[in-house]
């Protein structure tokens, strides 16, 4: 009787190892791609672009020369349109970039002829230049207002200890007080002082000449915390208290807050002898709606 089985004869060697032909067949046999993988496969050949390139930037349509997009080699646009990367097209055959195109025209104008945007669009175009990594445009925008002035302002704020932390504290305190009181606005006290050294009372100018020599141990007698919510200072720079107040209002307003402030007096903390604190205290009013 002949017994027929459904298995092919085992070609493996007695020691359990596969023959060289079996190993080669297993190694060379490619995996069969699924329909999903085949549908998302990208072209293997370099993508070719026409001399005049139609663009769709987030729904905004532009047309420019290929040489314009490749003007600066170390930019994202030059890399995208180098042929090394695949760029999808829309239904009309325009090359699509998934980015808001509101200010892409200013980017193109710089690439075409070196034109710069007006002041009111400098900040927005700067963000686009960062995204597309256009170094020459970034350099020129940084030398324009308001970015040039912002660099000077940040240099001053860099001397201010914990400026950002204290700014966030102002917002958080104002929010909590408004929520707790179910109020439209909240008020808080802020102390802003440039110098650590306390001064004598205003009504006794003669006492200004009576300052005594202080030792290091005496310094503790002058250290105290004014009864306020947040304090800023001291700092070493030409910029004064009013400059810092301007920075506070600017940065709070940039968060969409309505800010009012006024000086409501000074800290009258008595320290030692004829020395009082006299740091100015400001009331900040944060309106939420």
From Swiss-Prot:
InterPro entries: BTB/POZ_dom (IPR000210), SKP1/BTB/POZ_sf (IPR011333), T1-type_BTB (IPR003131). GO terms for cellular component: cytosol; plasma membrane. Residues 53-141 form the BTB domain. Coiled coil: none annotated. It is found in: Cell membrane; Cytoplasm, Cytosol. Interacts with CUL3. This is BTB/POZ domain-containing protein KCTD7. It comes from Bos taurus (Bovine). The lineage of its organism: Eukaryota, Metazoa, Chordata, Craniata, Vertebrata.
